């Protein structure tokens, strides 16, 4: 008789393998004392934070050290054996709480869980029916049935189980090292025919934590594979993204076995390699129906929408709460762009639990969840479920009645709205929005902000257009980067520094262009001309070589100045660019005249060379400077530059150009500057750059910058101004 019972128990244990999850409440044969000991042993492996969560569920104090918390739970468990108060459900409930806290799952109240176990309302995670009380005291589980498999479901709405494959189930024990689980199974002909009957039917391998679940979450299991792991099915390594995000449960995806499935008469082999798993996993194969994001979107569209009145009431309540004694909030801004795709929303959705009016595109959200199922709101990061997603009637009405180019709308307290145009104008100086510049030759010019020109700017720059270009101050380059010219047009006597760089930046240029001639073999070097006929309204900041010097284009040296920035001036607004990304208005268009002054002042021989009378007048300079002193390339003596007193009070405080030159040994010495600062000497004529020519004439001809460039003392006559400071 005993042998028969033993055989029956063995058969029942084998039947347990056909379930994705076994019932941990079945191990009660050792009596209540053994259950209490097992619960205590499992409890002692928990961390302090986990112990506090258990105590909170038990309505015990959560203060004290780890040993104190453990003693409280031990005493609570030992009360199960009090005389006259035998409680067999207490250790069972504690085990469930321990299992749930190990996977960072929310814990129910102990009293609720205890009542559920006592009344038999606790459900097996696979079976759909309720387990009777007697089932909790037995080691046997109900036999496998297809109806039970059909009742099983996952938290992911993309998969609906149809049939669970027999013998394709395994449990992965905790492992401190490498491990491998092998599984062999056949798929019957009827299941093969089922897969062929519908294209949406697939054979998938699922994995999840082998833990008990209470009635609140029964029938809904998150997909989790060991991390890291590797799957090999019938000799093929599966590339499916089953691992998900590290340390984020429920972000994995099942593995698709359908393409590698063998015929019904052959055995399928599955190998799962894993490393260092601290929890038990159960893996199982299901034939499931796969739903596409578009199919799920159809379900969302059939649901009732979040009514407009609820949204307007929230807007009114929120704006009124933000009011204080000094500031009254009258409106808020709503973006019509999806935060996931950064494109115009078509199906604005959110949940009733989200405390914001901003929505996201439902279809884009479903596509993202099909890849990495985090199931968090992309705006507030709160957990959401598929069944909670709804279309916002208020936002949907705005999208339907707005032009395609509108990206934001302004919403008033009463729920009315109006489109916001030119939404790229995020930062602007209101003082400079309508700034009048007195220009001696051109009269009075009214400067107006034109933020819609951000797209036209790149086009005009590449096409060499000098009209309506925004002013640019590039502050993202380092000392070692090559100089990027601001204008496509170069005067015939100014040689581009780097033809390859210009070809990369301005692909529209070609060798046949009238503005670009790569065959300058003996072009005089010097400061760029300020003649309006050549440069019109665009000017570049750069360091300069000697007037009248010559060099071959192939020997053109790189810029040794640490400016690595350029400024162009137009009648448009000014913008600052970071990494050639989106532009932000920063400086006024009055920078045009300031650029002229800067160019003239940086000329080592004074502003009279290649400058207009207007520039000299702006600088307060009358007449011409002395002629250029002769340059002896074999002389080690420093040639003093002609100086001229002038007033620098008209220069703005934020235009300061830091320069670096050469030491006495002729080597380049660079000075690094802030990414948000531009420098220029306070009095450039008092300590302007001095040449340090090399004695070696051959070196001079080859590396002109190292022989004829200039050195400025930044410590004596320059100051640093941070544009980000007040």
UniProtKB/Swiss-Prot annotation:
Modifications the protein undergoes after translation, according to the UniProt entry: Autosumoylated upon ethanol stress.
Positions with biased composition (Polar residues): 510-533
Location of region: Disordered: 507-533
GO cellular component, one term: cytoplasm
Molecular function GO terms recorded: double-stranded DNA binding; SUMO ligase activity; SUMO transferase activity; zinc ion binding
Zinc finger (SP-RING-type): 323-408
Every PINIT domain range: 139-291
Positions that bind Zn(2+): 354, 356, 377, 380
GO BP annotations listed: chromosome segregation; DNA double-strand break attachment to nuclear envelope; protein sumoylation
Coiled-coil positions: none
Associated pathway: Protein modification; protein sumoylation
Compartment(s) of residence: Nucleus
EC number: 2.3.2.-
Classification via InterPro entries: PINIT, PINIT_sf, SAP_dom, SAP_dom_sf, SIZ1/2_SP-RING, Znf_MIZ, Znf_RING/FYVE/PHD
Record-annotated SAP domain positions: 43-77
Assembly, per entry: Interacts with CDC12.
Further comment: Present with 3170 molecules/cell in log phase SD medium.
Protein name: E3 SUMO-protein ligase SIZ2
Organism: Saccharomyces cerevisiae (strain ATCC 204508 / S288c) (Baker's yeast)
Taxonomic lineage of the native organism: Eukaryota, Fungi, Dikarya, Ascomycota, Saccharomycotina
